Each structure stands twice: as structure tokens, then as C-alpha cells.
């Protein structure tokens, strides 16, 4: 709810990469738990493959020794990486009203898929 009392329309769920590939430390809603292996894990795996390709390109363009950036992102070690799913229903256009306000993303890479 904002200062005027208007309710939020945006829903978020964050799924930790560690929970996808290792023992989950969080309990997720039933639909996520049910589809963790068939939908969530393949999605996260493909996203990581895309990010690894981008890191390889950056690594090459920066003239770093091969694998330098990937070494900073080991797959099976604790990480702060997560998949975030955002649900926001269509709204009438209002240039002064945004569903997701200004914010800072964290980490090495952020992939946005719509």
C-alpha cells in the first residue's frame, strides 16, 4: 500500500539458485514445489547457460585469462543468485505511475525476460 492507501498490484516470488540445485532452505508455495524439477530447474539451468556465455564474452573482450569470470560463479557453491518471477496485471497507461519503482539490482549479471 502506498501513502495514499492505494494497494499494490505487483506480486513477486524469488527462488534461490541454491534451492534449485541443492537442498532447499526455504519452503515454497505448492505450485513452485510441484514444478521445481520439471519447470523451475530447467529454466534456471538455461538462464545460467546464457549468463555463462555472456561472462565468457566479457572475459574474452576484457583480455582476462580463460575462465576467470566463470571461476567467480561456481554452480554448486553457495550464492545469492535467484530467479525472480514478477506478476503485474495490465494497467491503464499512466506516465506518472509505475508498477515497479526505481531500484538497484545486485550481482554480476541481471537477465530480464518478458
Residue ranges and their predicted role:
Residues 1-114:
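Peripheral, non-catalytic segments flanking oxidoreductase cores
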Amino acid at each position: 500500500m502506498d501513502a495514499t492507501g492505494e494497494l499494490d498490484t505487483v506480486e513477486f516470488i524469488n527462488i534461490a539458485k541454491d534451492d534449485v540445485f541443492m537442498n532447499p532452505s526455504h519452503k515454497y508455495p505448492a505450485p513452485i514445489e510441484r514444478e521445481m524439477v520439471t519447470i523451475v530447474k530447467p529454466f534456471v539451468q538455461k538462464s545460467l547457460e546464457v549468463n555463462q556465455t555472456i561472462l565468457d564474452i566479457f572475459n574474452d573482450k576484457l583480455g582476462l585469462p580463460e575462465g576467470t569470470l566463470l571461476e567467480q560463479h561456481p554452480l554448486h557453491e553457495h550464492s545469492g543468485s535467484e530467479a525472480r518471477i514478477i506478476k503485474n496485471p495490465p494497467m491503464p497507461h499512466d506516465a506518472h505511475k509505475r508498477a515497479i519503482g526505481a531500484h538497484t539490482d545486485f550481482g554480476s549479471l541481471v537477465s530480464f525476460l518478458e
